[in-house]
Amino acid sequence: MILVTGGLGFIGSHIALSLMAHGQEVIIVDNLSNASLQTLERLEFISGMYVPFVKIDIRNTPALNKVFEQYSVEAVIHAAGFKSIEESALKPLEYYNDNVSCIMSLLRAMQRTGVRTLIHLSSLAVYGQSSSTLSEEMPFNYSYPNPYIKSQQMAEEIIRDTALTDSEWKIAILRLSNIAGAFEHAVLGEFVAPLPKNIIPLALQAAAKQRDYIELRQQAHTLDRTVERSFLHVLD
């Protein structure tokens, strides 16, 4: 069984659905701070399966220990955490407390229960701003002044240091950026706030004539001076 933290969020729910489609059993934990039980209902509707779910804050290590003890967890995919660069500048303590404390609590619970397989969803933002072609070997830009980026850098360092203590650890870190799209049944997708900040929800609102235009303030070295972005479909 695979435990998916943040499994009712946009990325986590699609991960859970893909795992079930490939015959894997999943257990979802989520504190519902940025998700809804409606997503759980949709997962069960699409898959036709019962999906075990436990509402907990994974910073609560004793409660997380009980989940590991109750279910036969063999691996963890960590998709929980705060993810807004802009918001983190306004709420730095919340971002450090959530993103750093979550990974520490999760690793403690895994260590205690003997689970040693982890996929951690990090961010391409750990590199900071760079004009170079990115690679896994590139060092982090620790001087970039943003709490979200720093919290992800800290989380990766904690994971690496923990992995060095036991050769049984099998860990992969995925540095994601600009995840978009939705499941083909059109009943599972991104939770969009009333005032979205991501460009795809904004573009869809403009296309649906719910707003007049999208304001692009940044200038770039492109033909029309606007920023070019690459996107990764959530099912990829």
Task: Give residue spans per PLM region.
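NAD(P)H-binding glycine-rich loop region in Rossmannoid oxidoreductase-like domains
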Residues: 58-98
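Glycine-rich NAD(P)-binding loop of the Rossmann-fold in SDR/ketoreductase-type enzymes
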Residues: 35, 59, 75, 94-105, ...
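Active-site Tyr-X1-5-Lys
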Residues: 129, 145-182, 201-209
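NAD(P)-cofactor binding segment of oxidoreductase domains
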Residues: 70, 90-119, 157
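Conserved Rossmann-fold NAD(P)-dependent oxidoreductase catalytic core, especially the SDR/UDP-sugar
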Residues: 78, 104-147, 165-167, 172
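Hydrophobic/aromatic anchor residues within beta-strands of the central parallel beta-sheet
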Residues: 53, 95, 118, 171-174
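N-terminal Rossmann/SDR dinucleotide-binding element
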Residues: 1-75, 195
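A conserved pocket-lining segment of Rossmann-fold NAD(P)-dependent short-chain dehydrogenase/reductase
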Residues: 88, 141, 177-232
